[in-house]
Amino acid sequence: MFTGLVEEMGKVVNISKKATGLGITIKGDKVVEKVKIGDSIAVNGVCLTVTKFSENTFTADVMYETIERSGLKRITAGETVNLEKSLTLTTFLGGHLVMGDVDSEAEIISIVPKGIAKLYKFQLEEKHRQNLKYVVEKGRVTIDGASLTVIDTDDASGIFSVSLIPHTLENITLGKKKVGDYVNIETDLFGKYVEKILKFNNAETEKKEKSGITMDFLQKNGF
């Protein structure tokens, strides 16, 4: 689990194809300090497990499911990526709870200067636009591993926007991207849980109503 606060930008130094997916080696400084085999590091918002490390690099495997859902399918050697080590019980939670499980990609469709800030608009892939129901105005969304505040949404077209100040743009990879580029998106974890619970409760209620055993029935019969 992560906070969505990018610790540093690292650089991809090597990519190798494997039978199970990809092997990726990334250069970093902060995230490699005290790292151990088996530790989790978010790479552009994708939770990867460290399989090997050196003084300033770490290596991880990427499975096909992850490759298909994320921008790691387009990643190249020399590319800059956002990095964050997994949180601990003493980690300052300055962003929001991020799982490192990317839902889909989104395309940058516009970048407009707004005073000192820049307004970015994103459009979810059509087959994943149902995920916009978990993106709410003034809520949080994870973009390439960075926890950002949502300005507004357009559910019909799968579009949402965020506004970024210069400091943020200088410290995450989004500041280097342009219109037409794609980013990894992870939507709100709690929204997914609430939806699942409500669906389950509704299904259970329907079953009880069909059987004739409802809360009213139980109360009337002394239960």
Language model segments and positions:
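Conserved loop->alpha-helix
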Residues: 1-223
